[in-house]
């Protein structure tokens, strides 16, 4: 139970950067919150899979091991997909990608890095708790 609570709290803390503005052309003028990463279908499914893998006891232990990782990777993919698809119409696909990278606030990168670090933190906590329970 202690491990489940710790992993849940760490995951929720890793989502804090999404509460800040991550996309836009200028601070205070046009800002898009990182919450859109969680409200798209991939983000919603990723969060559900993460918590399902932690809190639901499946018959096969591999499912409990895999679901949180799938959820964490899903959050990262959700962030990257939103980066590349949020909206500035352009004349070509290449211009659209240039616009996306030029109109990202630093908190996007902070959130992305924290999401990647979360995978390693999760693995460390999971290994340490498993070692202690044997």
Predicted regions and their residues:
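Alpha-helical membrane-associated segments of multi-pass integral membrane proteins
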Residues: 4-14, 94-128
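Loop-to-transmembrane helix junctions at the membrane interface
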Residues: 53-83
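Interfacial non-cytosolic loop connecting adjacent transmembrane helices
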Residues: 24-41, 80-109
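Membrane-interface helix-boundary signature
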Residues: 3-7, 32-42, 57-68, 98-104
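Hydrophobic alpha-helical transmembrane segments
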Residues: 40-54, 112-114
């Amino acid at each position: 139970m202690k491990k489940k609570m710790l992993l849940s709290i760490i995951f929720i803390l890793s989502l804090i950067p999404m509460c800040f503005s991550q996309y836009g052309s200028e601070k205070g003028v046009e800002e898009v919150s990182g919450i859109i990463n969680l409200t798209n279908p991939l983000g919603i499914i990723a969060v559900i899979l993460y918590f399902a893998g932690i809190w639901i006891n499946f018959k096969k232990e591999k499912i409990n091991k895999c679901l949180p990782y799938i959820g964490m990777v899903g959050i990262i993919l959700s962030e990257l997909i939103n980066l590349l698809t949020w909206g500035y119409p352009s004349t070509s696909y290449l211009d659209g990608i240039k616009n996306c990278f030029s109109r990202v606030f630093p908190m996007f990168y902070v959130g992305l890095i924290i999401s990647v670090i979360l995978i390693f933190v999760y693995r460390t906590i999971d290994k340490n708790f498993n070692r202690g329970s044997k």
